[in-house]
Amino acid sequence: MAVVTIRQLLDCGVHFGHPKTRWNPKMKRFIFTERSGIYIIDLQQSLALIDKAYDFVKETVAHGGTILFVGTKKQAQESIAEQAQRVGQPYVNQRWLGGLLTNFQTVHKRLNRLKELDLVDFDDTTRGFTKKELLIQRRERDKLEKSLGGIRNLTKTPSAMWVVDTKKEHLAIDEARKLGIPVIGILDTNCDPDEVQYPIPGNDDAIRSVALLTRIIADAAAEGLIQRHQKPDAEGSAPAEPLADWERELLEQGDAAKAELPVEENDVDAEVSAKNEAKSEDEVAAPVHAPESDDATEAKIEAEATESEKAPVSE
């Protein structure tokens, strides 16, 4: 079942490409026709590639992976932040910092610094900091929040990356290729399809087009999260993270209690069955009185009436 229809793609203007003067010949196989000097993208191919990218993102997240949403152009900033936050995935919608992936250890130190500054009360001057020092720390926090706020919970390099406008985000794609990170991206008619493992031919300049395709990728991540949480319950597998000693002790106590439970139930069942057998024996031993018929009852009443008439009346 398709996750989106061609009508939705048409309504959002996904089929509009760049003018003929701005195109990449490698995108020729994704171009349907040309109208008024503008290339029209083949939405049938886009639809098939959307389904392929959707399945990849869903399986990646279901197996514990993360998707980094990247889109720093104005048309994509709002939708990138909104959809990534909706499904709890990291995102970059401001300037891409060089070495964010290839030099992640240094970036991770800056993330720890950001978390430290989040705990500082900048209005409290009784902690040993002057107003000037607190002002400097506040500015540092704001700067880190703007550049790294979207990836504050990222503890390792992402499993895959969603990119809006692969031509503009060439630095991010270069770092992903060096680390072997798969890239899912919107390919306009001026992009190079060889740079992306999961291309989606479409318009990367229209706000509605970017919002629609980003929402589809976010929906795939959301479905993957649902599968990830349902998988341990269905398969009975152990959690991925190691258990603490007190958690393991509680689980062992619970298992021991469950092991004793069937024995108690068997004893109760045996006692109930014994009582039922004793009750049935008493019922068999007791005499059974057949109910009197209607004729016998009438004869008994007539005999009592006759005896009362024959009895002498005392004066």
Curated annotation (Swiss-Prot):
Residues 250-315 are annotated as: Disordered. InterPro entries: Ribosomal_uS2, Ribosomal_uS2_bac/mit/plastid, Ribosomal_uS2_CS, Ribosomal_uS2_flav_dom_sf. Residues 272-282, 297-315 have a biased composition (Basic and acidic residues). It comes from the Bacteria. One of its GO terms (molecular function) is structural constituent of ribosome. PROSITE patterns: RIBOSOMAL_S2_1. One of its GO terms (biological process) is translation. Keywords: Ribonucleoprotein, Ribosomal protein. One of its GO terms (cellular component) is cytosolic small ribosomal subunit. HAMAP family: Ribosomal_uS2_B. Belongs to the universal ribosomal protein uS2 family. This is Small ribosomal subunit protein uS2. The gene is rpsB.
